[in-house]
């Protein structure tokens, strides 16, 4: 079955995170949540921070989050080297997405159950995020803040929710 469009999963219902009860839950497809200069002593010289803040609440599937991470990391590692930035994804995709598969062909009413046993099969994972929460941060030196902003702008294009990029000093980050 192909992947359903993101509009099917954009709205928040309730979190479904208990992996103990979910058999066959898909794994998280994001290999790394921290990239670049990950050691604390290497990050001491970074004074500027670019923050990607979500403006509307909703769900972001792990596919979109991984695409955003790849775009930001690819740009930053090409323009700067890995030791000149720190990229971190703040949120973790705990929510498991289920799908009650429906057949759409002639005679399908004899093959499927309809709404009987409509719990669904786990098909993916997502982040449930509230308005104003931080999704990604990039720490850089002052001279590289335009590159951090461009990286988050490229990542923002891959996300289904509207986002805002904020530029701050390292000591002023909230939430």
UniProtKB/Swiss-Prot annotation:
Pfam families linked: Ribosomal_L16
Keywords in alphabetical order: Ribonucleoprotein, Ribosomal protein
GO cellular component terms attached to this protein's record: ribonucleoprotein complex; ribosome
Top-level taxon in the UniProt lineage: Archaea
SUPFAM superfamilies according to UniProt: Ribosomal protein L16p/L10e (SSF54686)
Gene3D superfamilies for the chain: Ribosomal protein L10e/L16 (3.90.1170.10)
Native source organism of the sequence: Caldivirga maquilingensis (strain ATCC 700844 / DSM 13496 / JCM 10307 / IC-167)
Family, per entry: Belongs to the universal ribosomal protein uL16 family.
Protein name: Large ribosomal subunit protein uL16
High-level lineage: Archaea, Thermoproteota, Thermoprotei, Thermoproteales, Thermoproteaceae
Molecular functions (GO terms): structural constituent of ribosome
PANTHER family recorded: 60S RIBOSOMAL PROTEIN L10
InterPro entries in UniProt: Ribosomal_uL16, Ribosomal_uL16_arc, Ribosomal_uL16_euk_arch, Ribosomal_uL16_sf
A Gene Ontology BP annotation from the UniProt entry: translation
Entry annotated with the keyword Transcription regulation: no
